């Protein structure tokens, strides 16, 4: 099978990484940002088309206020510190998620990241911020309902393609591979619509320990998968892989 065009990652385990080391959760989030930087560079070096990162869930607002403030501060720091480098490296930044109720300074930073890089032609870095897939789908349905109510849209013409065109990810191909770190085996309200035919890879290592070698191993695992897209015959055949490891940490198989 050919290499994935679009990889999406649920960056899980920052808090558990910190707890295992007797550190505050904030230290885990900071280590997670360092891993993020490294993987974005690695994805660009490998010629990946799209990398989507689940940075902040719409459910994360229920966390303790101090942790939320720390996460927002890290987002601001990442954009202010790294945006120039991303732009120099020809990375295009896209933000998905609900922005209407975000603080004005955060909205301004997100808009700046998109506007500065919108002509870049290298890696498409998609940051899911204040994102929840159910909310995304509800917003898309409401948009279609408004068009129906206004007489602009015949309900019988609504298709899967039209729904996709009204999602935050309009114009972005569905992920070929979704990776989740920290051993959890669920999507947690991430790209539910877009994941219809994605391959999944659940790794035991916590996100701060995820390295480019793990990304390379994910590529190799993907190459060994058989993707049928609802058909009978796979579009590419290879031997199935039973064990999935985090080679950088020699983690247990999942």
Swiss-Prot record:
Binds 2 magnesium ions per subunit. PROSITE patterns: UPP_SYNTHASE (PS01066). Keywords: Magnesium, Metal-binding, Transferase. Its EC number is 2.5.1.-. The active site is at 12, 60 (proton acceptor). The keyword Transferase applies. One of its GO terms (cellular component) is cytosol. Substrate binds at residues 13-17, 25, 29, 57-59, 61, 63, 180, 186-188. The keyword Glycosyltransferase does not apply. One of its GO terms (biological process) is polyprenol biosynthetic process. It holds the Pfam family Prenyltransf. Mg(2+) binds at residues 12, 199. SUPFAM superfamilies: Undecaprenyl diphosphate synthase. One of its GO terms (molecular function) is magnesium ion binding. Its cofactor is Mg(2+). It is an enzyme of class 2 (transferase). InterPro entries: UPP_synth-like, UPP_synth-like_CS, UPP_synth-like_sf. Catalyzes the condensation of isopentenyl diphosphate (IPP) with allylic pyrophosphates generating different type of terpenoids. Homodimer. PANTHER family: DEHYDRODOLICHYL DIPHOSPHATE SYNTHASE 2 (PTHR10291:SF0), DEHYDRODOLICHYL DIPHOSPHATE SYNTHASE FAMILY MEMBER (PTHR10291). Belongs to the UPP synthase family. This is Isoprenyl transferase. It comes from Brucella suis biovar 1 (strain 1330). The gene is uppS.
